[in-house]
């Protein structure tokens, strides 16, 4: 990727353990399996899996440092963390992984098909690859200005941030197409909704709203006064108990490439 992302996961991950349990459930790893998480972030999903070895790969040294702290009490010496750019060949041997996960990575990569082929290369013959992604165009906020909220969400979905090599914020709804185009066997398709009813620091809706503001500020796409006014409106809704936020995550469970 173009560079190390800001510490976005630190703001979002702690309040969505259900997302990581969902992903771990899709992996369905057995105690003797080898599991790789491509774009592991701070290790929250790997901490949920049973495996003889977990491998986390991420471009961010800061995320990997946090992942080491998260995984040490769970997996001890059975975890391996590697800093690598996922647009390059993966530092994993052919047919060496029983389970491979890629969550919220594809939108950032310039060649998704090449990456998926690389991920499939690492799978053992009976292995399982999970392609999972948030569809950022499904971000829902109750708002005092519906049209403005729609505009901000769409703009955020389409904004390439400095640490991204590409942007496709709606990739979540296209995962089946990606998998089948790459010759994978699609075994299952699932979705989950993450919900938050408070607009407070540490809550998911608060985190995503401030991510939106930060991204659009950095891109110079929206006036600061407009963004500040939008956040103020969300705070007022929270004070009245009328705030609600949700987003959709999609996942495709895949077997190895068709011959």
Feature roles, as predicted:
Residues 90-99:
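A short acidic, Gly/Pro-enriched loop at the edge of an enzyme's catalytic core
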Residues 113-128:
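A short glycine-rich, Lys/Arg-flanked "PGG" loop and its adjoining helix->strand segment in the class I
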Residues 130-199:
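Conserved catalytic/acceptor-binding region of the Class I
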Residues 36, 42-89:
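Class I SAM-dependent methyltransferase SAM/SAH-binding core
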Residues 1-17:
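Class I SAM-dependent methyltransferase Rossmann-like catalytic core
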Residues 99-111:
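A short SAM/SAH-binding and catalytic strip from SAM-dependent methyltransferases
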Residues 14-33, 48:
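Conserved alpha-helix/loop element of class I SAM-dependent methyltransferases that forms part
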Residues 2-7, 188-244:
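C-terminal helical/coil "lid" or tail adjacent to the Rossmann-like core of SAM-dependent
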């Amino acid at each position: 990727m173009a560079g190390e992302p800001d510490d976005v996961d630190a703001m979002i991950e702690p309040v969505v353990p259900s997302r990581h349990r969902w992903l771990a459930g899709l992996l369905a790893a057995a105690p003797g399996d080898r599991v790789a998480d491509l774009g592991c972030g701070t290790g929250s999903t790997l901490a949920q899996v049973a495996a003889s070895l977990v491998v986390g790969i991420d471009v961010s040294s800061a995320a990997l440092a946090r992942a080491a702290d998260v995984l040490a009490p769970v997996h001890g010496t059975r975890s391996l963390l590697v800093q690598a750019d996922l647009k390059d060949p993966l530092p994993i041997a052919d047919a060496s992984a029983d389970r491979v996960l890629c969550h919220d990575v594809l939108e950032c990569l310039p060649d998704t098909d090449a990456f998926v082929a690389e991920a499939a290369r690492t799978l053992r013959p009976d292995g399982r690859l999970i392609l999972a992604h948030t569809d950022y165009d499904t971000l829902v906020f109750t708002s005092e200005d519906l049209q403005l909220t729609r505009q901000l969400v769409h703009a955020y979905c389409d904004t390439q941030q400095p640490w991204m090599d590409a942007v496709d914020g709606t990739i979540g709804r296209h995962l089946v197409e990606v998998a089948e185009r790459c010759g994978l066997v699609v075994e299952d398709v699932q979705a989950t909704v993450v919900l938050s009813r408070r607009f407070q620091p540490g809550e998911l809706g608060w985190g995503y709203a401030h991510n939106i503001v930060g991204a659009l500020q950095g891109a110079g796409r929206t006036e600061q006064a407009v963004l500040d006014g939008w956040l103020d409106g969300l705070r007022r809704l929270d004070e009245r108990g009328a705030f609600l936020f949700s987003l959709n995550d999609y996942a495709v469970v895949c077997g190895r490439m068709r011959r």
